[in-house]
């Protein structure tokens, strides 16, 4: 049985994206290795305290950036955090800008996702006898996004609050035709990881908001060099430093009790009659379904 490893105070999770493989300012840091019913998460988690709050940090692509977007075990990552009683997630990622107004090193806080992936199997915890359909009309926690917007702007960063993040598979970047199409469709930024995390966090009743750091203009600006891994390295390093400055101020403002709408996302999502739930599936999902057992 995969019971919760932290039945104390609700914790905060930070998922680090490209260029962000550590988090500064953690008191009493220690590494935690977790096995989940879905396999291993991307890497060991780092546990520590910031502003007297329990925080867990997970590098999405593993330290040393060893995992492609399509190789990520999103279920294991989110399940591992939920098993540690994480109820809020700050998800950090690099994105390409599809609009002139979003410049490299700007921060975009997406309010919507458009999922164009085709290689992300298993973006749900449910099945095997228990059916649930969570609402994703608003996939981002408005409350957490508002905190991040206020604190990041207060630190002097250029913040764009709201926007549509289109999620592609990768690992190759877009063609010019694709990039221009995405622009004309009205999408704001493009990335490779955000949508799956938002879906699974909602099923796990975790409030999630995404900090998307702009590194490039994708390839729609014909007067600029098209995006490449080498051209974005400097922006990645600057963005990682910015993220480390933002975390403490945001974490300090997150409430102590998980009472936002996302924390009760399963109230009207579970379809299968409780009497019909298979015991094996219940054991597997105990961390997520604890309120209903």
Please report, for each region that a protein language model flagged, where it lies by residue.
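A short, charged, Gly/Pro-tolerant segment at domain boundaries
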Residues: 259-293
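Generic non-transmembrane alpha-helical segments
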Residues: 143, 147-158, 245-253
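Metabolite-binding pocket within alpha/beta catalytic cores that recognizes anionic/polar moieties
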Residues: 2-137, 292-293
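Active-site/ligand-binding-proximal alpha/beta "capping" segment
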Residues: 154-188
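His/Asp/Glu-rich mid-to-C-terminal helical/loop segments that flank catalytic regions of hydrolases
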Residues: 219-266
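Zn-dependent metallopeptidase/amidohydrolase metal-coordination segment
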Residues: 192-230
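Short acidic/polar active-site loop segments enriched in Thr and Asp
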Residues: 87-88, 188, 207
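Non-catalytic positions within long, well-ordered alpha-helices that form the structural scaffold/packing
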Residues: 82-85, 183, 202
């Amino acid at each position: 049985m995969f019971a919760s490893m932290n039945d104390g105070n609700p914790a905060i999770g930070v998922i680090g994206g490209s260029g962000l493989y550590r988090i500064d300012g953690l008191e009493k840091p220690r590494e935690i290795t977790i096995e989940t019913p879905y396999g291993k998460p991307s890497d060991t988690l780092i546990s520590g305290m910031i502003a007297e709050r329990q925080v867990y940090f997970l590098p999405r692509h593993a330290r040393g950036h060893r995992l492609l977007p399509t190789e990520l075990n999103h279920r294991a990552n989110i399940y591992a955090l939920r098993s540690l009683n994480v109820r809020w997630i700050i998800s950090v990622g690099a994105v390409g800008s599809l609009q002139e107004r979003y410049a490299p090193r700007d921060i975009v806080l997406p309010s919507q996702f458009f999922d164009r992936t085709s290689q992300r199997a298993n973006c749900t915890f449910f099945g095997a006898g228990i059916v649930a359909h969570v609402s994703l009309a608003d996939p981002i926690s408005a409350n957490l996004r508002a905190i991040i917007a206020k604190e990041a702007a207060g630190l002097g960063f250029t913040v764009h609050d709201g926007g549509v993040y289109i999620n592609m598979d990768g690992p190759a970047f877009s063609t010019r035709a694709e990039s221009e199409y995405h622009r004309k469709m009205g999408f704001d930024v493009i990335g490779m990881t955000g949508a799956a995390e938002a879906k699974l966090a909602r099923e796990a009743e975790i409030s999630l908001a995404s900090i998307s750091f702009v590194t490039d203009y994708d390839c729609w600006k014909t007067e600029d060099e098209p995006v490449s891994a080498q051209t974005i390295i400097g922006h990645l390093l600057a963005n990682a430093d910015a993220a480390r400055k933002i975390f403490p101020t945001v974490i300090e403002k997150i409430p102590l009790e998980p009472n936002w709408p996302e924390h009760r996302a399963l109230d009207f999502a579970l379809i299968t009659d409780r009497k019909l739930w298979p015991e094996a599936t219940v054991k597997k999902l105990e961390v997520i379904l604890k309120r209903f057992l």
